[in-house]
Amino acid sequence: MPHVPYTVRRFQDGVALFTVIVFIMLSMLLALWASRTSLFNEMVVSNDADYQRAFEAAQALLQDAELDIRGENPDGSMCVGAGNVCRTATAEKIPLEAKDIGPLLSSLEAHLGQCRNGLCAKRTGSQDFWNNKDSTKGITLGQMTTARPDGTTAGARYGQFTGAQWESSSDKPINPILADRSTSGRGGWYWIEVLPYDESSKNSGVIVGTANNLLPLNLTPSVIYRITAVAQGLKSSTQVVLQQSYAQQKLKD
C-alpha cells in the first residue's frame, strides 16, 4: 500500500494582525492629539494677539483723552480745528475756569448716564457699566455708545475731539480696533468724568506739604478727571477696560 504523506496545516493565530492594528490606533491617537494641541495653541495665540491689540487701543484712547483735556496736539502745540475737533463747535467743553464747572455739570446731569460728547458728571451707583446689559439695573454699555436723537453720544471715539488720525492707510497703519466703527458696539470709546476738587485742600496740608514734602498742586480750575477707556477686540469675547485719574497742572510762568 503506497504511503500517503501527511501534511500538517498551520493556522495563523492572528497575533501579528492584532499588533499591527494596535500600532495603527496608537498612531492615529498621536496624530489626533498633535492636531488638537496645535489647534489649542493657535487659539491661545490668536486670543492673546487680539487682547494685546485691544489693550494697545485702550491705551491710545487714554492718551487721546488726555490730549482732549489739555486741548493740545501730540507735539504739545495748541489744538486748532473746526467742528468737533478741539471741541470748537461742541457745547460740552473742558472747563478752563472755576465758573465753568457748575454749568457744565448741571448740563451733563440732565442727560442719560450723565454723559454727553465724552464728558461726564461723577457716576453714582454701579461703576462698571461696561459689564451691564440690563437697563433695569443701571446704565448699559449700549446706552453709553449708541447715538441719541440729536446725533450725539455719551462717549467719544478716538480722534473725535483731537483730530488724531484713525483711518488706516498704506503709509499710516493704525490699530484696526480704533478704525472699526461699523457699529456703535465695535471699536473703542472713552469717557471723561469731571470731578471737582476741594479748594480747601490746597491749604489743608493733606496733599500740599512743606518744601521737604510733595510739590504743591497747581490746579486751575480745581478739577480731577477720571478717564475710562473701553476697547472691544476683533473677537466678540475680547474686551479691555482701562481707567486712570488725571490732574491737569498748570505750568507757572
Each language-model region and where it sits:
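Terminal alpha-helical segments
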Residues: 2-253
